[in-house]
């Protein structure tokens, strides 16, 4: 059977369901696919296969569907730990999320934790589905729960007053009954997602950035750096900066080649070699990035949200304490750094997720939301994301 051609006509957006255990995330996911995609039964989604991202095992279900306006890729995780790992490793990048809250319970501990994580790892937009409304008889109670959700979102710097909240029953939609709280509400939810969660800028439209993987010297031509263009476009003749590890340097790209052919440009997703003017072989190294001047700056101090692997995942067998000094693997290279634990935390156990401070011994081209691995002698022991740059 030939693979169906992927229709590129509609804008593509990545979203996911988040929220407390048993509030109905997977039921909602199934209900959406029933109305807008190839129907996936609850069990198909819930029995998500395990996959490895940065050496960490995560169970994630991927479904896709489309509205009139857009094509969506949607992730749903069976367990709370899977969400934490997913959000921190960025295994499934989300442009926005549907926060599912049981109307009868209101916000619960994991509701709060997922909102906080969303804020820390840079999920820019959320839409709320208040589920299981058929279990609440009292209209006033629904209003109270809605108020509580809005306040909670605002306390984590989401615009709680503006976020669309749709109240309905995912199960009713899935079972095809009570359309006024079922099907109609799923349609209303997807309309809100269409309207409220903006289409992200495509990678080629963002400022140019390429992590340097290798450096070669070509006699008579100069220095070539190779890597995969992460975003943006580079044209021959563009002025660019080399950022990270050493002082930032300006240079000009005098050539772009791919598969040994000369091109006039390279764009997001391309593996290229870029010829740099006036830079010698010793003047540039793996771990630095090429970027549009002024778009990214080098930093050594930041706050991070991290997940520490369990022994079973191949991580540490013992806890670590203040002043722990592992390597932080950013893009293509390891840099040693010192960890500062938050007030009141004495030690960190394998399997924990937490926020901590890091100071690197050399600067790295860094932005909020940049992912990294925590390593000890080449072995991955954790994963993290830069939540706030300090200096």
Swiss-Prot record:
Region annotation (G2) ranges: 55-59
Primary site of residence: cytoplasm
Gene Ontology CC entries for this record: cytoplasm
UniProt region (G1), positions on chain: 19-26
Annotated stretches, region: G3: 76-79
SUPFAM superfamilies linked: EF-Tu/eEF-1alpha/eIF2-gamma C-terminal domain (SSF50465), P-loop containing nucleoside triphosphate hydrolases (SSF52540), Translation proteins (SSF50447)
Positions contributing to Mg(2+) binding: 26
Region (G5): 169-171
Keyword Nucleus: no
One term of GO molecular function: GTP binding
Catalysed reactions, semicolon-separated: GTP + H2O = GDP + phosphate + H(+)
EC numbers for this chain: 3.6.5.3
Subcellular location(s) of the protein: Cytoplasm
Disulfide bonds: none
Xref: InterPro entries: EF-Tu_GTP-bd, EF-Tu_GTPase, EFTu-like_2, EFTU_2, G_TR_CS, P-loop_NTPase, Small_GTP-bd, T_Tr_GTP-bd_dom
Domain tr-type G: 10-201
Sequence intervals crossing the membrane: none
Binding of GTP, residues: 19-26, 76-80, 131-134
Swiss-Prot/TrEMBL keywords: Cytoplasm, Elongation factor, GTP-binding, Hydrolase, Magnesium, Metal-binding, Nucleotide-binding, Protein biosynthesis
Segments for region (G4): 131-134
Family label: Belongs to the TRAFAC class translation factor GTPase superfamily. Classic translation factor GTPase family. EF-Tu/EF-1A subfamily.
Subunit note: Monomer.
PANTHER family per the UniProt record, alphabetical: ELONGATION FACTOR TU, MITOCHONDRIAL, ELONGATION FACTOR TU-RELATED
Function: GTP hydrolase that promotes the GTP-dependent binding of aminoacyl-tRNA to the A-site of ribosomes during protein biosynthesis.
Protein's name in the database: Elongation factor Tu
Organism of this sequence: Dinoroseobacter shibae (strain DSM 16493 / NCIMB 14021 / DFL 12)
Gene encoding the protein: tuf1
